[in-house]
Amino acid sequence: MPLTPDIPRRTLLLASLSPLIGTDLARGQSRTLSADWAQTISKARGQTVYFNAWAGDEQTNAFIAWAGDMLKAEHGVQVNHVRLKDTAEAVTRVIAEKAAGRHSGGTVDLVWINGPNFLAMKQQGLLFGPVLPLLPNHRLVDTQTKRSNLIDFTTPVEGYAVPWKLAQIVFVYDSARISNPAEVPRSANELLAWARKHPGRLTHPNPANFLGATFLKQMLYELVPDIGVMQQPATDASFTAVSGPLWAWYEQLRPLLWRGGRQFPENGSAQRQLLNDGEIDITLSFNPADAAVSAAGGQLPASVRTFTLRKGTIGNTSFVAIPYNAAHAEGAMVLANFLLSPQAQARAQDIRHMGSVNVLDLARLPAADRALFDRLTPSPALPSAADLGQPQLEPHASWMTRLAAEWQRRTLR
């Protein structure tokens, strides 16, 4: 995923590099945008697109390889997956190229991006666009109920990135151990009450990891009367006032956690293993299909099920974006448009492949294309669209940074 576990390092890295370049988007635009899609297709033929994407998930890597095969066969476009450990690698490469005056022929054609990395590129004039309105499949994007397709961590996307897939917080439990669905906790207070009845059977990843920090964000959303305040940057005063109820709640929860709240799994994979080993009963994931995919792959028992909170859960969109100096922008546009196609979106949503939530408004699709989604691999662990509900928007990124730092200060003192 583009948002990597090391929150402080990425934030400091991008902040330290931002003085190197200007903030005027117009200065970053070096080529004329063409609304003639046939011309774009023609120019793309024979190009090699260097798609810079996080490579930490083999299912995603396989999907990118499949998309490359499809583009080669249909449009004569070669896709090379530049495998990243951290999206900031690609961002800093574009920053360095701009600082060196390399305003064309750049080494990054397309990058999987969101969050602080997208904000940095958008603010610093590193993006080609607005590109989304030029793609034929942009008309299929859901901009009503999937608001994160338009707003990325409070930053308006404004067509400078193309939605690819959705993520949303879900909770996973083993129905063999929690057999009564009425006992499943669906709020922060119910989660605390459940933990009191079942001490040691709940945990969350370390908030130095993105998923652990998101657990804190989600619980804060549960406990504040107006989550809108978190759409603004956190200040010392607002953070202290707004986060107070969270820490009061967490001080009660922590002793009831796995290993007395003295140790935490490093990431989602480690937390999932604890569920599989029977050490805990509930986990969380940013992939609604995680339980279904893991059960199908033997990493979780077949009895796992998925639930969300009564007031909803946080969701965000992964995007692809084209740097301002991309050597093969036309090929990158063709790839981005293909990723929006019903064919690609349905394959990505199938738990045999990625299990990601689509970014489309299915009501806009012709019947034949809608049928692709009706034929997806079923699973009792897979939540329905109604189960997920409308995702809550991510708060401003400053809240995540402060929550992770404050948790560390309180926990390690």
Task: Enumerate the predicted regions with their spans.
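Alpha-to-beta junction loops
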Residues: 97-110, 126, 198-201, 277-282
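Extracytoplasmic ligand-binding site segments that recognize negatively charged/polar headgroups
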Residues: 54-66, 81-89, 108, 112-269
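Early extracytoplasmic/lumenal segment of secretory-pathway proteins
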Residues: 31-119
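A ligand-binding cleft/hinge motif common to bilobed small-molecule-binding domains
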Residues: 118-120, 282-301
